[in-house]
Amino acid sequence: MRMYDLIEKKKLGCALTAEEIDWMIAGYTAGEIPDYQMAAFLMAVCFQSMDVSETTAMTLAMARSGEIADLSGIRGIKVDKHSTGGVGDKTTLVAAPMAAACGIPVAKMSGRGLGFTGGTVDKLESIPGYRTALPREEFFQIVNEIGISLIGQSGQLAAADKKIYALRDVTATVDSLPLIASSIMSKKIAAGADAILLDVKAGSGAFMKDREQAAALAERMVGIGEQAGRKTVALITNMDVPLGETAGNAIEVAEAIRTLRGEGPQDLTELCIHLAGNMLYLAERGSLADCLKMAEHSLTDGSAYQKFYQMVERQGGDVRYLEDLSRFPTAPAYPVLAAQDGYLAAMQTEEIGATAALLGAGREKKEDHIDPAAGIRFLKKTGDAVRQGEPIAMLYTHLPEKVEEAQRRYQGAVRIAEQQPNREPLLYARVSAEGITPL
């Protein structure tokens, strides 16, 4: 087999066999296929695409290229949840304890964040003492004893994906649907869960800017999951507006805790009920309607908060921070003022996320330091009435030299109009093996 022939085959729009894809991924991971040939192949995929069988073969080959987590030591059906990311997306901190409170095991390995704010692991490390690196035996033991553990993921999962993503990043081949789908799903399959729930964001703060793109990605990933023997469901959700009331790290953890107590914002609460409900459905706990009711009940009866509390305590976190949210670190606050009277008509969510990163809440490079106290509180969101000079957001930072630029960027990222805009739904659709159901 020669890499030249596989590049030529894909250039002509022909489908590769699973054997050819396995050979290519193994060879590239081992350093036997040079970057320039893999880059040529990736560009051919951008122009000619891949069908579901090819994408599944590529996903499985990448999953097998590194360590595959064996979760058989954890009792019950394990459901993994993945979000394609956005601004204010603290859903794992809420939906995972909700699902665990309803009796399903949640063994979740999450990443650190590159970009707007920290990932789930960075957010959890805002709680002093919380251990995100656990030996496998302890991770399993905690899940078997209390039903949930959230830790950092091994760098050894889907080794080929890491290498291929770095190449895509510098060769303008990031935005290919089969390459995006195989990258996400290779890590999910390597993480060892029995079923997978995907939260595919659509909008100005999402990787997929419109619903049609998001639906195509969701359908492809569900197809891969099902072909790989994992029951898979995707929700297509709105990221034209930041989720919840905050973007940052400690500030998002505090908001997640309030939500677990039943005191959170309506959009975050509603989305987490749907995410936890679908996790329960995938774990075969009942009909979807019953599972959604169970998820909602875990917030009203306090069991979801108790489950989060148990997990933090068990993993060495200081639970006094959960009992008294004012303990979380804070930074000096600076308001962003409305430039005129009217209604907040639109938010450029990606630019708002970039503003949070400018304040110190995110990182551009792996080694960058995140300030847990930095972030943004959204006082007004799309559809809200505003008065000139009224604060529409609060910026929190220890970098006073960045404030003026951050205020200017935030003001430039929102549009105020005379007419109140129509409110877009939070959830657009649910995608399963049976097809797309509008929500």
Model regions and ranges:
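Phosphate/diphosphate-binding glycine-rich loops and adjacent basic-rich segments that engage nucleotide
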Residues: N144-A193
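A glycine-rich helix N-cap at a beta->alpha junction
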Residues: K123-S149, E219-G225, G229
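Active-site cofactor/substrate anionic-group-binding motifs, chiefly glycine-
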Residues: S49-S110, L114
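Alpha-helix C-terminal capping segments
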Residues: F47, L93-A107, K187-G192, Q227-A228, ...
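N-terminal glycine-rich anion-binding loops that anchor highly charged ligand groups
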Residues: M1, K10-G73
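Short glycine/serine/threonine-rich phosphate/pyrophosphate-binding segments
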Residues: V87-A95, A100-A101, K108-M109, G115-G118, ...
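Well-ordered secondary-structure scaffolds
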Residues: D5, K10, A15-A18, Y28, ...
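Active-site-proximal beta-alpha loop/turn segments in soluble metabolic enzymes
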Residues: L42-V45, K123, D161-V170, D199-M208, ...
